[in-house]
Structures are given as C-alpha cells and as structure tokens.
Amino acid sequence: MTSALHESSIKSLPLLGRGKVRDMYAVGDDKLLIVASDRISAFDVILDDPIPGKGQVLTELTDFWLRKLAHILPNHSTGIQPEDVVAPDEVDQVRGRAVVVKRLKPILVEAVARGYLIGSGWKDYQASGSVCGIALPAGLQQASQLPEPIFTPAAKAEFGMHDENVDFAHVVKEVGQEMAERIRDVTLRLYGEAARFAATKGIIIADTKFEFGLDDNGTLHLMDEVLTPDSSRFWPADGYRVGISPPSFDKQFVRDWLETQPWDKTPPAPRLPRDVLEKTAAKYREALDRLLA
C-alpha cells in the first residue's frame, strides 16, 4: 500500500486546529491551508490506523464538485497552490491533499439534503413518520427514494458528539428567515444537480451534507468538503434494493469489522487489520474513479 499521512506537521504556518480528518493552518489573516489527512473515524472515535490515499481522494473529489457546481454558488477556493505557501521540505505533506481557501465565517448549521430514507432519517421516520419536521408518506421502507429531496438540517455538535437533527425553524432562529431559505434552496439545488450527474455514472447519492460560510460582504459561500464519501452516502446503483441498507463507497468495512470486536466505542479503538485498510482504501478510490470516469 502507499504510505499514509495520519497527521500533518507544517511548522512554517500557525496551526489553528485539527478535526477528525483535516488539519487547518493560517495563511495570513484572510486565508487557510487545509490538509486532508488519511485519518478515519468510526463511531466518533479517531482511529490510530489511517487509510492510505484517503486524503487525496477527498481533496480531488471536492475540487471536482466545486468546479462543477461553481455556477450555483461561490465557493471557498482561491486558486493558490498549497505548495506555494509552505516550506520546501513540507511540500510532500500537502501535494494532492491540501487546499488554500478563503477564510470565511462558518454558518453553524449542517445543511443536509436527503433523497432516500436511510440512517438517522430512517430512524426518525420510524419513530414519528417525519424527518426534521417534514411529514412523509406512510408506508416507506428503509432506503426508499423520497417523493422529492428534502432539506434536513442538523445542529453542529461538540467534537466527539453526534450532530442533532433539527427542524427548519431552528435554522431560521440561528441565521434569520432570508438566509435560512437561501441555505435550504441552494442545498437542494446542489444536491439535485450532483445526484443527476452521479446517476449517469451508476452512483446513487442517497444524502449529503454541505457546509456554508459568509465572506466579509455577507455573501454565502460553499466551503469545506463537498460530495465525498465522508460527507455523503454513495451507493452503487446496481446494488440498490428497497428495504435493505445498500453497500456504500465509504468506511463501511471499518464499521462492520469494529462491530465484531469487543470494543465499547470509546478511545482507544482496536487496531485495524491490513485487509480492512486495503478494502476501505479501494472503496474510496472506486468512488473517485467512477465519478471522474
């Protein structure tokens, strides 16, 4: 397998923080260097074993979608090459896995679009017949396609905690009526266009999560990762069946293996065997290869 990057170490720039996957550095006062590591998390625990090549896949896919969807909404891209903002001996850490982006004020709402009933949406529907306050028809099954895509926001949780599904009124309270409607409408438009494109490649985008931010003029921008296996459920269309949870192009191998282990889902997690690492890396790569083919 190719070598993997668990954690970047860019000494030439101030480190602002590390998320589950990304490390963030300041580039002056108005830009950020974001490095996508090969870290992987499961059950909100960061694992010790990285997935080789994962960070490059996430970066390449996000770049692809940002260019493809740029006519809908401005995004955080600057066009500056990450190799140009780090020291020469740090270039290998950023090549193919980092971006230099505008420093935006993040909107603290997860903008989720769902076209299919799965995951927390399926659990909510089973309990109440609705998702995020949106009533759905009776009789839907797990993985059913919805009559039309829906906007199902979530409140950002503290690190290590699960995001909480909320209704549209919560978003209005956070950002105001006009901005809430703008976020909802653009989320559904981005999802719709991406889902139609992915369908031509034999991939169903069941749901996805977008992140938005504002520039100094208050203009809404698309930011962070976009339509990757980490932020979306990608299903192979030929494996889709209503009533079951379809296979997906993501870390399912990792989750499934961990479920077989005597582990209480608190750190530290068990070490992953080589075959699980290799299969997971291949799934991420397959999603990229299919979409960009």
Swiss-Prot record:
Top-rank lineage group of the source organism: Bacteria
EC number: 6.3.2.6
Keywords: ATP-binding, Ligase, Nucleotide-binding, Purine biosynthesis
Pathway as given in its UniProt record: Purine metabolism; IMP biosynthesis via de novo pathway; 5-amino-1-(5-phospho-D-ribosyl)imidazole-4-carboxamide from 5-amino-1-(5-phospho-D-ribosyl)imidazole-4-carboxylate: step 1/2
PROSITE patterns found in the cross-reference section: SAICAR_SYNTHETASE_1, SAICAR_SYNTHETASE_2
UniProt keyword Secreted present: no
The keyword Cell cycle belongs to this UniProt entry's keyword annotation: no
GO cellular component, one term: cytoplasm
Catalytic reaction list: 5-amino-1-(5-phospho-D-ribosyl)imidazole-4-carboxylate + L-aspartate + ATP = (2S)-2-[5-amino-1-(5-phospho-beta-D-ribosyl)imidazole-4-carboxamido]succinate + ADP + phosphate + 2 H(+)
Molecular-function GO term, any one: phosphoribosylaminoimidazolesuccinocarboxamide synthase activity
Signal peptide residue numbers: none
Gene Ontology BP annotations: 'de novo' IMP biosynthetic process
NCBIfam families, per the entry: PRK13961.1 (NF010568), purC (TIGR00081)
Family that this chain belongs to: Belongs to the SAICAR synthetase family.
Stored PANTHER family: PHOSPHORIBOSYLAMINOIMIDAZOLE-SUCCINOCARBOXAMIDE SYNTHASE
Listed name of the protein: Phosphoribosylaminoimidazole-succinocarboxamide synthase
Organism: Bordetella pertussis (strain Tohama I / ATCC BAA-589 / NCTC 13251)
Gene, per the UniProt record: purC
